[in-house]
Amino acid sequence: VSRDRECRVVILTGEGRGFCAGLDFGGYGSAPGFEWHGKVEQGFAVQRHIASLIPRLRSLPQPVIAAVNGPAAGGGFALVLGSDIRLASASARFNAAFIRIGLSACDIGTSWLLPRLVGAARAQELMLTGRIFDAEEAGRIGLVTDVLPDDALMDAAFAKAFEITANTPLGVALTKEGMWSALEIPGLQAAIDLENRQQIMASFSDDAAEARRARTEKRS
């Protein structure tokens, strides 16, 4: 996907009535190359392989829109958190389910992502209880930007994608990279330094030149 120049936006949604209920523990198997290692080594290799999904989403040049059409639990919840834009249907439900099966709720990036979306206090409550919360609450606490009727969710996701594609691919990719990097770097000046470099890179691109010509000529 990352090398597909025809793909401008990625939309994640579930098939059927749910977004993603999490990992299929019975069918995951072992990590390649670790089949003959001990249980601890195998388990750690599998864990690292699963957790690498979120950095892979982050590294895509295309924005990722999560269109949450039902329950998003455990690993599915992490997929929502790792997306760039989050929309939910009225029937969406969320929970950090790991803690409900005797594991830590800190998994697949959840402990880093959730506090940055909803604040540390709310994240601690949701992760320590593992409780299920609905789309209305998700919207109220800022986890999702929009809550829509079930039959309007995908139309809204595609409309948002088309809004994004009105901008240049490079500008979008640099904005996504810059936003994620700004969350990870420690201070304002470091963020500004990164922004300065990105703006100069973008300003000399063919896309930016064409966008300026279109604006001057009042083309869309």
What are these regions (language model features)?
Residues 1-8:
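A short, well-ordered alpha-helical element
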Residues 53, 57-59, 67, 73-127, ...:
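CoA-thioester-processing core
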Residues 87-92, 144-193, 206:
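C-terminal long alpha-helix characteristic of the crotonase
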Residues 6, 14-56, 102-103, 186:
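Glycine- (often His-adjacent) and acidic-residue-rich active-site loop
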Residues 85, 125, 129-131, 137, ...:
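Well-ordered beta-strand positions
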